[in-house]
Amino acid sequence: MAKKGTGESFTAPVSAIVDRARTGISNVDSDVVRGTISKIPNRIRRRFRESESSSLLTLFPIWAVLLSLAFTLSLLPHSGVLDCRDGFDNPSFCSDEPALNVNGDLEVYLPTDDDPHSVKNLIAQVEKDWTTNVMVIYVESYNYNVTQINILDQIDKVERVINNQTNDGGADDNVIYVLSISTVVKEVNSSGGRVVKAFFSGLAEATGNQQLSDEINETIDAQSDLIGNYAIPDEQQRVDQILQEMPQNALDKLVRDVGTATEDRAFRWNRAVIIIGIADDTGDKTVGDIVSETQGKIDEIAATNNWGAPDAQGKCDEDSNPLCLRMTLTGPAPLTNAVTEESFKLFWQVFPVGVIIVASMLFIFHCDLLQTGRIRFVQGVKVVIIAGLPTLCAVWVTLGLIGLLDYEVTMTVILVGPIVLSLGVSYGLHITNRYAESKGTPHEKMAAALNSTGRAVFLSAMTTIIGFISLTFAPMKPIQTVGWALAGGIVVVYFMTMIMVPNLTILLDLKKPSHPPHKVFVAAVNMPVKWSKITLALFLTVMIISAGYNRQNVEENIDLLKMAPNEVEAVQKMDVYSTEFEAGQPGFLLVEADIRADPELGIGSITADHPYANLEGIENLEAKCNDVENATAVSIVFLMKAIAVGVNVSGSPINDLIEDTPLPDPIKEVAELIFDRGQAGNVSFWTILDTLDAQEDDGGRQVQNFLLYVFYNSMTEEMRELFISPDYQRTLIYIDMPFMDVKSTAATAEQINLWAKSAGDSENPISVLGDTLIGVASITIEVNNLIVDSQWTSLAFALGFTIVTLALVFRDIRYALLTTVPVGFTVAMQWMVMDSGGVTLSLVTVMIGSILVGVGIDFSIHIANRVKELGGTLDAIRSSCASTGMSLFEATTVTAAGLTCAYGIPIEAITPFVTVIIILLIIAALSALLLLPAIYSFMVKSNLGLTGGATAMVKSSGLTQALIKRDIDATDSPLDYSNDAW
């Protein structure tokens, strides 16, 4: 009974509640409910329509900032900031694999076209049969001649470790060929046995007597130690004999006497090079991996063979009796790799310095130290966070997007960071300054700031983007990538600024007092307004001098070494190699001529193509190229001159055996040359071929062809295909040139091209592909020629589209033209600045003009926008320029200070670029502050008006005074100097 009572007491109140709910629901008018629900979407839409875009940006301040930071952090690993580098090499935190896809090859600057004789397509023709990926091991011997057996043995050890699978085309070890004094000595030393085998191989092919060939091969294999094998000889006398038979041009390519620390000559060869051809297809390995592995192998051999550690004077610790030998990896491939892998590592080392500099400058300008002499620490820190954090995020996001998209870039893209960092802070400052001027609640002040400043910031961003986009019209892809990256960076900065700055400002509740403009700026502006004609004449004179005189003195010069980080040992040694060996810019003459020789005997062996005649044409062209200043040429002919025909063979009397065998007379003649050293002596293949060529009968021609067949087959495949294509229809003449200025490079290349063209009209005519030198020098010259065209193209686009954009925004073409004049002046001044500093037009400095358009137009826009708002009178001009002067000074100082961090990047080409940019930034600010008011004042005083159309007609008719007075009355508040917060 108790339990039942409890249940009844509980259900009674519940029933009462349910009854009341039913009664209430029954009294609800369903039509009213439906009407209310149907109005909800309309109310939401009306609320959004009533809300300004500025208030929407600040609806959720904390979430907006947090989402922006989260987005930045998600892209951070792709920006390269976590790449391993000096001081940050813990594999737990950093990545050995570069985040950005950087290509340091100069060839990427070449445009792609359909012209078969364009530089890029000619290089592709060479790459069908040969590799253009080359490494050079620079050998320095301080105690011994590099051709002494003990040093040759060390070079041989390095070669055998690096090229452990010879004649494999790089399939197993990624090395196609090795060329050095060691390989030539080994090639010549082992040629005897291969000559004999090649002779009997040709004999078997010509006569069908394969049994005799097999018997002789067994004899040769048994006497390999006596005849010579592919190794460094045991006797120095044999090495010296081989060297004496080598042509001088071949020796100059492989060994040099560069003197000592105190003497010009050492009277011995104390430098050598090992030239290594790398396969184009290296599988999973990158060129960087191969470079690292090769240097590691060299270091290991050095440690185990007591090379010692030569100091700067070439001295070694004699206690351990070292060889005092050093080998350093350099050459085009390591140089390209240094640009590829080291550039961004170096950038991230100096970028924090730039961040600190920009933050410090922001703090100094906004802590009231300059305005009142007192420091408002909290205020300064708030401005640093508000203006600096979005820009820092924008830099990381920009580089992160480049890395995420795997967009191929070049070394020049490292300029994106400092430029975006320096420019980006100004957008945030414009908003915070106007926020500080406004009254009301934080949201009301921000709405007012965005409504008044948002248009100017958007216009600044648009014109800056246009300036940077103009770089994409250059014919060189790397400059296009810089343009896209900078333009994309400004887009990111704009969105980050519009999202983060308003919300950070509200969250931090920034409060800044307003200050009147400094008297210096008021006085400076009064001069061009008062003496507008004199100011215009002065600026015009300086511009004419720069564009007319200084422009002619600025030379175009491409120097790949200056675009590489000079702290890398491979780069330093490349400069030494270039100087001491007069090499470093490898090039090729691709000769299209049939030099094939068959062992066939009889009249059928004499074909229309005369292989020796073509070889003579190659030898003549090689000799003429060697006579050209700053050029060293070698071809297959140098090996023909270095390898002797005669062979020492003991045991079976091979020559007697041949005499007893019925063979055609040409075969017996060749046999006498090879096996009768008493008759042939120590004569080279080339000498014998030349002697046979003097014979007018067909027998001499048959012997010549048979001997050529023997020579080709006596070479190792690796050495033969270094010079000759597998089908014997194409051969290379290797041309080496030192790194020089473009004028000297062009002069040398032009002379070589003349000889290449004349080779088709010589006594022994041969065809050179394109009649031109192919390789690094030709790329340098072609890119240099493209620089000037790309500069004018990008400048024309930048200025043209900037004017169009301003005309659309201001709705007046005349006002747009007048506003752009200071930018044109700044661009014209680049030649005076570059000429004064001895700066050449390079792959980096060529971008200065377009970057200045993007940066400099900002200065003019802020003044022009304020002048237009205030009515375009003389007072409006004075007020606008004076109140904007301090902002220009701040923007210029912060931008220049931020760019100075790039001085810390050890790449020589960047230093003059940064210097010129900083100087021209100052000129851009001065031209906006002085030239622009002079132009406006002149137009107003001349009654020409600042704008066209109906406004100009009113002014020209003398009806302006009432309008001007009305405009001044309507804009009294903006004209008050105290309203500019800076």
What is the meaning of each model-derived region?
Residues 2-359, 367-377, 511-792, 941-982:
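Feature of extramembrane
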Residues 372-431, 814-863, 946:
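Hydrophobic transmembrane alpha-helices and their membrane-interface caps
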Residues 63, 349, 353, 385, ...:
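Alpha-helical transmembrane segments of multi-pass inner-membrane proteins
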Residues 361, 402-405, 458-506, 512, ...:
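Hydrophobic, glycine/alanine-rich multi-pass transmembrane helices and their short helix-loop junctions
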Residues 344-389, 393-397, 462-470, 788-825, ...:
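Internal alpha-helical transmembrane segments of multipass membrane proteins
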Residues 719-723, 730-851, 861-864, 884, ...:
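Membrane-proximal extracellular juxtamembrane segment immediately upstream
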Residues 346-349, 388, 427, 439-474, ...:
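Pore- and gate-forming transmembrane helices of large, multi-pass membrane proteins
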Residues 1-21, 394-508, 904-905, 920:
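Hydrophobic alpha-helical segments
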